[in-house]
């Protein structure tokens, strides 16, 4: 029984973000569709070759996506919302882009599909939309074309397909409500057709992703798996693929399915290898997800070997990444600025492929010398002074309950804040960032490269902040922001100013569409050596009589959007960050900043996948936020911002944050998120986002007014704020001015009644 290795997927964007650049060039009309398609072909060929050269046996095909793999699956099935359809009924790449971003070089603009987090990761998918009576057919053959490409290049191909039950689980019913699970029998013939086409091409194994099987699914959904896979059996071998958690609670459902193999995430799940071996059918292949696809740390291969060695020779076995390497940067070798000690602790996607090759070879030969050599830096890290800071650990141990309590309750604070700020009804504000123009990015880049001295850099940033204040005053906004011209990314910026973080030059990972982020890496105990945001906030406030918000990224979001340490708990990291940012709140307040926003867009996405594990996470997540904020005086107004959230199931925790104002993303969901706040009788102030900043479309005054009136039916108008869904960093100034002017006009109309 020779052991093989494989990856569940590979990063799509390219080492230099070639896909992002090609997408944005095409969207802007600066390149042709053929040029865009050529970039995709080149990236796929390169990535297959890189994996092969790194020692991967079975190459994933179908993991590439022009925007998002869930959206690719929707198009495969012919699931195109009516508003995005071509007049002749055809589907092309512009159809895909209209669904993802609301517009494309061809076709009429229309509201983009809803976007939300992919399980508990920082990747976003486009939510499939279902309507009663809709029909499905094989429409978008990207998977088959890419399989043909890979076969023509001589590769050993393992197609990747999002499974039917998970795809339905991820979607939402629009219009007249019905059970979306009732669509399962309608989509299975398309899956059968795809599998038949793959069989014709000589494919032996298909990786069919059903990550919903790690969730606490309703019984009806669990029961749907058997008839679904009965319908799909017999054409090619199916590797049922799960990730992000273990499968033990649903193993009885899984073992009844007519598949030939199971992939299990042995990094994030608690499944024991011996128990899996005992309970899986003896003729099934086990794909062991031993290498963490979601982090950047070098694996302790001696430990991984010990974890799996007892079943070697007892069943067919593959070793694999825990999940797709989509969530990891591509190549550590191009990082020239990391110091050698720290660099030796990491492994990016290509290095993880090498780890899989080392592990496969050791399991096949029994020779573990190479594993011990690879794992040596991990032992050294455990004792490094770069990791441990006794002062931070002492401060963390001394936290008391009082450290997470504001001095008075919201009602008392609100009175003090009303007296201080005297804001009108329907107060208008933005979420924080303004367009990151070419001039701003060039300014930062020149400074970073040493082509610009500190004085000229600061003069340039000050000018952009001044422009942002002037623009906001001209528009008539009530609470202003400084625009964040000095910030490259809301998490990276703070990480750069906190001890305990390191950064990469090219450690890009895809967030959604063409949006890429370069997450900081937490390597040690976190502390704040000096104030971070105070200088620019104070300068912005000096330019206006209106209040200017101080802008912080909250501790849970910094944790969730960074690559965390693996040697301490996430709770420990979050509370260390909270203590560092608590000092920042105190310094902002002392500098005269009266409104401080602590963004926590990632609070919900950090939830464990199983509801039974939620309480512990929410307890420390809320406590971290409160430690961060509780130092503020009564007349300092604390805002928080959250996006891509469904709130129903965590309303107790949202209220427990005790923020004076919460702003949320609601426009894509047509204000339906406010239902949670209404039913809960949320006591504090709320700013429901009135337009979608992810789309370049400008909302009309009437549209915004209608949304606000809808909001006022659920939340008393005196507690409503008016704001966009999210920061405006990715937008251009023309559409930003137009949208904000309409937003302010809508608020003024409502004030007049």
UniProtKB/Swiss-Prot annotation:
One of its GO terms (molecular function) is zinc ion binding. It holds the Pfam family Meth_synt_1. Its EC number is 2.1.1.14. It comes from the Bacteria. Zn(2+) binds at residues 641, 643, 665, 726. SUPFAM superfamilies: UROD/MetE-like. 5-methyltetrahydropteroyltri-L-glutamate binds at residues 17-20, 117, 515-516, 561, 605. Its cofactor is Zn(2+). It catalyses: 5-methyltetrahydropteroyltri-L-glutamate + L-homocysteine = tetrahydropteroyltri-L-glutamate + L-methionine. One of its GO terms (biological process) is methylation. The active site is at residue 694. Signal peptide: none annotated. Binds 1 zinc ion per subunit. Keywords: Amino-acid biosynthesis, Metal-binding, Methionine biosynthesis, Methyltransferase, Repeat, Transferase, Zinc. Catalyzes the transfer of a methyl group from 5-methyltetrahydrofolate to homocysteine resulting in methionine formation. PANTHER family: 5-METHYLTETRAHYDROPTEROYLTRIGLUTAMATE--HOMOCYSTEINE METHYLTRANSFERASE (PTHR30519). This is 5-methyltetrahydropteroyltriglutamate--homocysteine methyltransferase. It comes from Shigella boydii serotype 4 (strain Sb227).
